[in-house]
Amino acid sequence: MATAAAGVAAALSPLSGRDYLSSADCSAEETSAVLDLAAQLKSGDRRIDLGNRVLGLIFTKASTRTRVSFQVAMARLGGQTVDLNPKVTQLGRGEPLEDTARVLSRYCDVLAVRTFAQQELVDYAHWATVPVINALTDLEHPCQSLADFLTMREAHGDLPGQTLAYIGDGNNVAHSLMLCGALLGVNVRIGCPQGFEPLPGVLEQARSLAVQGASIEVIHDPREAVRGAQAVYTDVWASMGQEDEQSEREQAFAGFCVDEALMEAADTEAIVLHCLPAHRGEEISPGVMESSASRIFDQAENRLHAQQALLAALMGGL
């Protein structure tokens, strides 16, 4: 076990002091090592004490799992969390981001930012002098993907060559699944209606990152997308900020519900994933949500372990 821990620490040492704004910010080796460390922390084979360091959360979007999992992860690492809601700080009164980022860097050892625009996150990283983590933007959700592939690995073993089918909008979650999956050697299929594809630039980037023969595909037939897949993943059809499009999207996504009939086309041992919150009866049927194939709540738990590993790596606590 000591040898394994040393190997993981060596692979993760280049991450110390770096930002994590995108799944593509880590190499294939570094991404795999984050999952290895997360598994060690989850099993209790590894314990890390960061010595009372401080995480600052800057969340302008609502959050349950991301907020709580970061807070608990930091506590388990022996650190503390400061919740910096813009509504109750000077950010809400127009203080420039560049001033806030530099001041918070004097108080905190790492910042996690959850906001709408990716550029705002990039600006925080530019001005901060401590690591900045993407806790979700409209472009990506990289911490979620770490938990997703940790869950898939727990269910089916080594990831290279496995297939994950994502059924739904080509959104931030889909983007990070493509990028992270490409690095890990996982075939990722995005099953979506016409007009709801991932951004072409992200698709091209994922394909350029693909290792060990992984394929990244966009397929407009949901049944074809899930055919033979080891994991079937879905998300809400209207993300935060798209509530006005709910009715239009319900029509566009008709036939894209992950239900019992669709799951028949997947691998017989396929697992079901959802980043939550879920709208039962829309993107996923109640039966599939509660089925034996569902690993949705394991997946939610794994946010904690994946982020604990990421925090330790970025703060050089290995």
From Swiss-Prot:
Enumerate the residues binding carbamoyl phosphate.
63-66, 90, 114, 141-144, 275-276, 303
What the entry lists under InterPro entries is as follows:
Asp/Orn_carbamoyltranf_P-bd, Asp/Orn_carbamoylTrfase, Asp/Orn_carbamoylTrfase_sf, Asp_carbamoyltransf_Asp/Orn-bd, Orn/put_carbamltrans, OTCase_ArgI
Per the record, the GO terms for biological process are: arginine biosynthetic process via ornithine; citrulline biosynthetic process; L-arginine biosynthetic process
Q: Give a Pfam family name.
A: OTCace_N
Q: Which GO terms describe its cellular component?
A: cytoplasm
Superkingdom, taxonomy of origin: Bacteria
* Binding residue positions for L-ornithine: 172, 235, 239-240
Extract the PROSITE patterns matched here. Answer: CARBAMOYLTRANSFERASE (PS00097)
The UniProt catalytic activity note for this protein reads:
carbamoyl phosphate + L-ornithine = L-citrulline + phosphate + H(+)
Q: Which UniProt keywords apply?
A: Amino-acid biosynthesis, Arginine biosynthesis, Cytoplasm, Transferase
The terms under GO molecular function for this entry are: amino acid binding; ornithine carbamoyltransferase activity
Pathway given for this chain reads: Amino-acid biosynthesis; L-arginine biosynthesis; L-arginine from L-ornithine and carbamoyl phosphate: step 1/3
Q: Name the Enzyme Commission number(s) assigned to this protein.
A: 2.1.3.3
* The keyword Amino-acid biosynthesis belongs to this UniProt entry's keyword annotation: yes
Q: Where does it live in the cell?
A: Cytoplasm
Provide the family line: Belongs to the aspartate/ornithine carbamoyltransferase superfamily. OTCase family.
Q: Function of this protein?
A: Reversibly catalyzes the transfer of the carbamoyl group from carbamoyl phosphate (CP) to the N(epsilon) atom of ornithine (ORN) to produce L-citrulline.
Note the HAMAP family from the entry. OTCase
Record's NCBIfam families?
orni_carb_tr, PRK00779.1
This protein is called what?
Answer: Ornithine carbamoyltransferase
- Give the species this sequence originates from: Parasynechococcus marenigrum (strain WH8102)
Organism phylogeny? Bacteria, Bacillati, Cyanobacteriota, Cyanophyceae, Synechococcales
